Amino acid sequence: MTIHPQNHDLPTGSAMKATPFEALDLVFHFEDQAQRQWWKQAGPVLGQHLLLANYDINKQYQYLCFFGHHIIPILGPGPGSGYDYHPLEISQNFQRSGSTIRLGFQPRAYSSCVSPQDPFGELSTEEAMARLGQVTGVELDLQPYHLLASHLNLTKKEEKEMLQPTCYNSLSPSFKTQGLLAVELPRTGSITLKGYWFLSAKSMVTKTPISELSFQAFRNIDHGKDLLVPALRPIEEYFAEMKMKPANPTTPQTTEFATVACDHVDMSRTRFKLYLYECLWKYDRLADIYTLGGRLKNAPGIAEGLELLREIWSILQIPEGYHFASLQNSLLRKSTNAESCGEASKPASEEREFFDDQALIFNFEIRPGEKWPQPKVYFPLAYLTDSKAADAVVALFEKLGWKEEARRYKDNLKTYYPRCDLDKTSGLQHVLSFSYRPKTGPYTTVYYWKIGA
């Protein structure tokens, strides 16, 4: 079935006043209603991001066409179709040299969402990359993907074990997917892809900590060349002291690895990334992880980054204490003794406790041939109303001297979510990330959820 636009006239006046989305909406058609719904709900938001970020008009058309013809067909059922996760995310990276728009998404063919053909999304991810790699204007090198996939993807035997009803039905969404993709939409040059592996299922079925799975995969890729190992070594040393455990949906740890990612470009330019979640929101804890217990104190840019992180901590009015998944609160209420809850038992401390499904996120970026890993911190924003979160982002931009971005940010946000009262909503601005490199200075990203809300 082909779905055609219905009565979408150009704005009053000259046709030249139509935005790229409005012009394309007159001629695009889609194979089913789900695809049409993705276009109508997410297309205008992407169009506004590109427009308000002052992308070249040709790039605006290119990226909207790319989204409509190549991303939407691999998103699966339309938005609001019973997802217990957010299958599409728009993010905007800000730095001194300007801003860049990026899309993050989970490739899910419709059949894989309603049948057991591809329960962990591995086939959908590979099919999506094969499709996107054929697009003119996309740079794609699958060597990094295949090297990591050979170590991190579930084997057929592991998949079968995870699909046992008593196991699979109790898993959270993070345990039921193996991969996500992201595409960067640069102002010049080619579109590039990045792939993510969520390793909770692999860890659970192999009874191996995610940290160990990740470190071993990176060492196997390095294959004795010492391109990745020097930067990996301080990470291994720091987390070896914590005695990391295999992932468990009912007994999460306070500090827990979750994800591995890499760019799907030539190996010499690929950034390999390790992501972890931290439940204790304290600045001293943040600083300890950011510096790997002091191992990075002499690395370029670390001191400057820490200074700005302290400013961000204050600007965001971080609610300090332990932040747990709501599942843990349920376990604690049902438990009659600490042992039956395992790691879900309350920590023996006087810190405040929140059961709000939020965590600080860190990633450590490893580039071939570089001595030091590059840390980045991700701050959840859902504890703030979107209006207050926007005020915090504006305050950060002003602190960084980005006056024009600060002036425009809140008005732009209202344009992305025209039907929302930002004083009453939360989580539309889902996460704010920050890193610092001496050559490029501060680098921050805002991640937007509930696209088209």
Swiss-Prot record:
Spans through the membrane: none
Domain of life of the native organism: Eukaryota
Catalytic activity: verruculogen + dimethylallyl diphosphate = fumitremorgin A + diphosphate
Positions with a binding annotation for dimethylallyl diphosphate: R102, K194, Y196, K273, Y275, Y378, Y443, Y447
Cited CDD domains: PT-DMATS_CymD
Residues given in the record as substrate binding sites: E89
Site residues by UniProt (Required for regioselectivity): G104
GO molecular function per UniProt: prenyltransferase activity
Keyword Transferase: yes
Pathway: Mycotoxin biosynthesis
Keywords: Alkaloid metabolism, Prenyltransferase, Transferase, Virulence
GO biological process, alphabetically ordered: alkaloid metabolic process
EC numbers, comma separated: 2.5.1.107
UniProt-listed PANTHER family: INDOLE PRENYLTRANSFERASE TDIB-RELATED (PTHR40627), PRENYLTRANSFERASE ASQH2-RELATED (PTHR40627:SF3)
Family to which the UniProt record says this protein belongs: Belongs to the tryptophan dimethylallyltransferase family.
Entries under NCBIfam families matching the protein: arom_pren_DMATS
Known function: Verruculogen prenyltransferase; part of the gene cluster that mediates the biosynthesis of fumitremorgins, indole alkaloids that carry not only intriguing chemical structures, but also interesting biological and pharmacological activities. The biosynthesis of fumitremorgin-type alkaloids begins by condensation of the two amino acids L-tryptophan and L-proline to brevianamide F, catalyzed by the non-ribosomal peptide synthetase ftmPS/ftmA.
Protein name as catalogued: Verruculogen prenyltransferase
High-level lineage: Eukaryota, Fungi, Dikarya, Ascomycota, Pezizomycotina
Gene, per the UniProt record: ftmPT3
